[in-house]
Amino acid sequence: MKAPLLLGLLLLSVTVQGKVFERCDLARTLKRLGLAGFKGVSLANWMCLAKWESDYNTKATNYNPGSRSTDYGIFQINSRYWCNDGKTPRAVNSCHIPCSDLLKDDITQAVACAKRVVSDPNGIRAWVAWRAHCENQDVSQYVRNCGV
């Protein structure tokens, strides 16, 4: 009786954790999905952003009580402006996707939405973590020895 319960709890924890990318695996994936140089933003800057926003975790979420919105996924894309989570007041959903799409292990939709975000006038500066940890920094370490 205890073994099936333990197995069930183990599987649940794996499901909730999602995929945590290895650094170079994420760098190769982002390059393949066209983020390297998109809107003038280097792959190293995207990697720095993903490191500080989610620690490369596809299932990362962060609730913002002030705006009653939530940041979702590897890029921590916000439900106020970019996706629909069904609970954020006055959500815009500029990426035209459910926020749950940003939590998938396949980050194709997250990358497409990140491209939409960075295409706005604020560009990469839309992300607080990028401004705090990546702007005007040597971000080459995030792609070092990845062959990208």
Swiss-Prot record:
SUPFAM superfamilies: Lysozyme-like. Lysozyme C is capable of both hydrolysis and transglycosylation; it also shows a slight esterase activity. It acts rapidly on both peptide-substituted and unsubstituted peptidoglycan, and slowly on chitin oligosaccharides. This is Lysozyme C. Monomer. Lysozymes have primarily a bacteriolytic function; those in tissues and body fluids are associated with the monocyte-macrophage system and enhance the activity of immunoagents. Disulfide bonds join C24-C146, C48-C134, C83-C99, C95-C113. GO terms for cellular component: extracellular region. Its EC number is 3.2.1.17. It comes from Leptonychotes weddellii. One of its GO terms (molecular function) is lysozyme activity. Belongs to the glycosyl hydrolase 22 family. It holds the Pfam family Lys. It comes from the Eukaryota. It catalyses: Hydrolysis of (1->4)-beta-linkages between N-acetylmuramic acid and N-acetyl-D-glucosamine residues in a peptidoglycan and between N-acetyl-D-glucosamine residues in chitodextrins. Residues 1-18 form the signal peptide. Residues 19-148 form the C-type lysozyme domain. The active site is at E53, D71. The keyword Disulfide bond applies. Gene3D superfamilies: 1.10.530.10. InterPro entries: Glyco_hydro_22 (IPR001916), Glyco_hydro_22_CS (IPR019799), Glyco_hydro_22_lys (IPR000974), Lysozyme-like_dom_sf (IPR023346). One of its GO terms (biological process) is defense response to Gram-positive bacterium.
